Amino acid sequence: MRPGRTLSVLILSVSTVSCAATTYDTSITAKPAPTTTVLPTGTAAVLLPQLVTEASTLSSLIVGQGDKLAVVERIEALWAAVSAEVTGKDRDLATEIGAEVVKGRTAAVLDRPASADKVYRDLTALVKAYLASA
């Protein structure tokens, strides 16, 4: 064997032997802080216009890299607070509003400002129809 080859084999052997399995200490992981959501209180006549106002800001937050998920969570909280009341009065409108709330989250997660604009337009029309019939 040539000296260069012997040295290469020796270095390869030493580096291979020095490899060890990697272990991860999972006891160090931090637990996420618990989150609590307090549902807004009020009637549908009060909270639904707030829902539309929140939806109006979603598109600009998606474009401007703002806290779009916070807006979505407020929209969802407002809807959760009044969905039973709206469903009791008009099940079809409640289904449509609920679907638009879901579409709002999808628009935010997928960064689609045009979809957020459509959600805002649809929610505006649906809330206007609900308030006119209430």
Question: Where are each of the predicted segments found?
Answer:
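Sec-dependent bacterial lipoprotein signal peptides
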Residues: 1-17
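Immediate post-signal-peptide N-terminus of mature secreted/exported proteins
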Residues: 24-69
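C-terminal amphipathic alpha-helix
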Residues: 54-61, 108-134
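Short, charged, amphipathic alpha-helical segments
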Residues: 69-74, 94-99, 117-122
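Short, solvent-exposed, charged loop/turn and helix-capping segments
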Residues: 76-100
